C-alpha cells in the first residue's frame, strides 16, 4: 500500500472512530438495560419499576437495572434520559406528576419537551386517589368536611403530598368548586404527609391509595371519597366523587415507560410487547395489587395520545385555579 493510500485509510478510521455502531433491533438487547426512576427509592414509581424490571429481565434475557436519579421533582432523571443515547439501553419509568404531564405548566423552565425529546414505549399502571381524614375529627362524609371548611375559612389544613402532583391540583380545584377556603400544606412525598395526617397536624389529604391503604383498613384514617370512575374494590362502601356531585374529580396517578428520541421503532415495539406481557403475568398483577395499583396495557401510539391529553387537561386546571409551585 503506498503512502497516499495508507494516509487515506488512516483518515477514514480517525473520522469514524467516534461514531457508535448502530444498534440492531435483531440482536437487541445484547447488554444490560438501565431503567431510570426520577424519584427516590421506596415510592410507588420505584416499587413498580423494580417489580417490572424483575419480570422483564427474565423475558429479555438481560439484566434490567433500576437507577434512581431523583431531584427537581423528577426533572433531573427525566432530562438525563432525554439526553441519553437512543439505543434502547436507557429507559425511563416515571409518573404523571411534574416530569411527564401534570406539573409541566407549573414548571416553564423544564429543559426538555416530553413528546419531542422522549418516545412513549408503554403505559405501566395507575393507582386510585382517595380523599381521607383523621377519624378523630368526626367528619364522616364529604359534606361534613366541606361544611367544616366553610365554617372555619382558611383554618382546615389539607396535606399536599407534592407540589405539581395530581393531588395538589385536585386540592386547588376542590377549593374552587366547593367555595371552601382551605389551608394547603405542601410535603415532600406521601410518607411525611400521611404521618402528619395520622398525627392530626392536618385534617385531610387527597392521597395515593398505596400510601393509605392499610391505615384505612386499620381504622386510623377514614376514606370519604374515591377519585376514580368506579368504586374501589378495596373499599366498595366508599362513594366516588362523581357520585357525590363532582364529576371532574376522576383522576389516577399513572406510570409510563419512555425512551430517548430517535430510538429504533423496532426496539420500541419489542419493548412494548415484552412490557405488556409482563404486566399480564401473575407475579406483576399480584405485586401491583398489593400496592393498590392496576396494570394498564397500551400500544406506543395509545400511550402518546394519552400523555398528550393529560398534558392539556392539567394545563387547563392550572390556568383555571391559578395554582403555583409555592
UniProtKB/Swiss-Prot annotation:
Q: What does UniProt give as the signal peptide span?
A: 1-25
Major place of residence: periplasm
- Presence of keyword Signal: yes
Instruction: Give the disulfide map.
Output: none
Gene3D superfamilies referenced in this protein's UniProt entry, alphabetically = Bordetella uptake gene, domain 1 (3.40.190.150), Periplasmic binding protein-like II (3.40.190.10)
Q: Which InterPro entries match?
A: BUG, Bug_dom1
- Locations listed in the record: Periplasm
Name the UniProt key words of this record, in alphabetical order. Answer: Periplasm, Signal
Q: Which GO terms describe its cellular component?
A: periplasmic space
Q: Which family does it belong to?
A: Belongs to the UPF0065 (bug) family.
**Name the record gives this protein:** Protein BugT
What is the species of this protein? Bordetella pertussis (strain Tohama I / ATCC BAA-589 / NCTC 13251)
Source lineage: Bacteria, Pseudomonadati, Pseudomonadota, Betaproteobacteria, Burkholderiales
